């Protein structure tokens, strides 16, 4: 077992009941273009077109053969674009249940699949987009070969669902998905799970099972990759989450794409925090209807630490999101707040009384201060368990020194890996966008 000692389990109120309930009816779904790093879409549909579930909506111009398919049947009601015509979202009003079917195999055939058969089915169905590379966190090229593949079957994000609860309903599909992934390449398939979980394993020649324990970010794929098979500019690995493995298993045994999602609907502003069954790309206004406390709320697709605000053309459940988190908008100002004892405030430092409390806090979107320079007081080192020097790395990201940042290990990271650094930063800096800018520059210029 790999035990993580550094990190932070955020003491946030609104933890979900670990029982799956049916969510509100899904009337509208969407694919969010900006989730796919570096993707340039070639549209295959127009507004007003009627599409089937599994039908191609757009293809990546930079990566021919990588298609993005409809998560439900219905009518394309909007294709939202932003500045410079960047694709924001393709919205579908859910109608009917027509769908496109793909190649189906029986369970005995799964262990005999060739890599080409696996690639063809994943790419034609759009499920290839469940895979992401490290470094750069992009959808892999159609002919790329990884050093290894990581399956994340644990989650230490605040307010997250327990994967074991979800997997109990789909164990056969999950093992089928692992079997399919083991046939995708000859390298290792790493299954990472919590040390105290009862997730059974399957006997596959190239499957390695790893147990992790400790505070967040022990459950992030970036942490797993760092300790098991670190990447470099010349070495790439792929990773995906456990619910996408279930979907892959169902695709190969039924010939149909599976877009159901079990997500945690939780946070201080949720009336009844729990796990709900919904659909990939679901409209979050519909999903949270009559579920939230009164007032101005911020709905987040994903974790409170690294998720995206669900608003306007982005008001949908993200492709990789397994959570819907809701906090209050913190717009009120506190006079001389820095001098008060702060028994109802949380800090990783011993500057407020809340640091010594075991209570859960009603966090809001307020950052409790204005932007200022980095202050190296050891806060970053407390929450980063990786074998890197976080203060120096963050300094290089802030200054745009990509050569030094690369030498210090930025290629191993994704935005979610620096989310805790953003949370504890005394200077209120957002390190995720800085990291993405550095990765884009490194990929472009080398």
UniProtKB/Swiss-Prot annotation:
It comes from the Bacteria. Its EC number is 7.2.1.1. This is Na(+)-translocating NADH-quinone reductase subunit A. One of its GO terms (molecular function) is oxidoreductase activity, acting on NAD(P)H, quinone or similar compound as acceptor. PANTHER family: NA(+)-TRANSLOCATING NADH-QUINONE REDUCTASE SUBUNIT A. The keyword Acyltransferase does not apply. Transmembrane segments: none annotated. NQR complex catalyzes the reduction of ubiquinone-1 to ubiquinol by two successive reactions, coupled with the transport of Na(+) ions from the cytoplasm to the periplasm. NqrA to NqrE are probably involved in the second step, the conversion of ubisemiquinone to ubiquinol. HAMAP family: NqrA (MF_00425). Belongs to the NqrA family. Composed of six subunits; NqrA, NqrB, NqrC, NqrD, NqrE and NqrF. It comes from Histophilus somni (strain 129Pt) (Haemophilus somnus). Coiled coil: none annotated. GO terms for biological process: sodium ion transport. It catalyses: a ubiquinone + n Na(+)(in) + NADH + H(+) = a ubiquinol + n Na(+)(out) + NAD(+).
């Amino acid at each position: 077992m790999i035990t993580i000692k550094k990190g932070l389990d955020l003491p946030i109120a609104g933890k979900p009941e670990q029982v799956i309930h049916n969510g509100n009816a899904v009337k509208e779904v969407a694919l969010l273009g900006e989730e796919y790093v570096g993707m340039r879409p070639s549209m295959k549909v127009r507004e007003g077109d009627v599409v089937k579930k599994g039908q191609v909506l757009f293809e990546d111009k930079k990566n021919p053969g990588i298609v993005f398919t409809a998560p439900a049947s219905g009518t394309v009601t909007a294709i939202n674009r932003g500045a410079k015509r960047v694709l924001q979202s393709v919205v579908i009003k859910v109608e009917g249940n027509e769908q496109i079917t793909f190649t189906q195999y029986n369970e005995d055939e799964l262990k005999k699949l060739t890599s080409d058969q696996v690639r063809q089915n994943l790419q034609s169905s759009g499920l290839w987009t469940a895979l992401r590379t490290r470094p750069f966190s992009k959808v892999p090229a159609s002919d790329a070969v990884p050093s290894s593949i990581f399956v994340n079957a644990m989650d230490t994000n605040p307010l997250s669902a327990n994967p074991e609860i979800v997997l109990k309903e789909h164990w056969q599909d999950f093992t089928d998905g692992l079997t399919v992934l083991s046939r995708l390449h000859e390298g290792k398939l790493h299954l990472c799970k919590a040390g105290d979980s009862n997730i059974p394993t399957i006997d596959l020649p190239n499957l390695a099972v790893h147990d992790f324990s400790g505070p967040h970010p022990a459950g992030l794929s970036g942490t797993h990759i760092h300790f098991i098979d670190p990447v470099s500019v010349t070495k790439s690995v792929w990773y995906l989450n456990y619910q996408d493995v279930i979907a892959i298993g169902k695709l190969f045994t039924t010939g149909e794409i599976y877009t159901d999602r079990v997500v945690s609907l939780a946070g201080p502003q949720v009336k009844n925090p729990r796990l709900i069954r919904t659909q990939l790309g679901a409209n979050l206004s519909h999903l949270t209807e009559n579920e939230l406390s009164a007032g101005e709320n911020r709905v987040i697709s994903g974790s409170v630490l690294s998720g995206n605000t669900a608003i306007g053309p982005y008001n949908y459940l993200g492709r990789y999101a397994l959570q819907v988190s809701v906090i209050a908008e913190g717009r009120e100002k506190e006079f001389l707040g820095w001098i008060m004892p702060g028994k109802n405030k949380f800090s990783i430092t011993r500057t407020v009384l809340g640091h010594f409390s075991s209570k859960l806090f009603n966090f809001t979107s307020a950052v409790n201060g204005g932007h200022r320079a980095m202050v190296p007081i050891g806060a970053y080192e407390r929450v980063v368990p990786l074998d890197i020097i976080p203060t120096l790395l963050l300094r290089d990201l802030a200054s745009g020194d990509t050569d030094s940042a690369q030498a210090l290990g930025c290629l191993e990271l994704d935005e979610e890996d620096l989310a805790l650094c953003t949370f504890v930063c005394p200077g209120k800096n957002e390190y995720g966008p800085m990291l993405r800018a550095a990765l884009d520059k490194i990929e472009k210029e080398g």
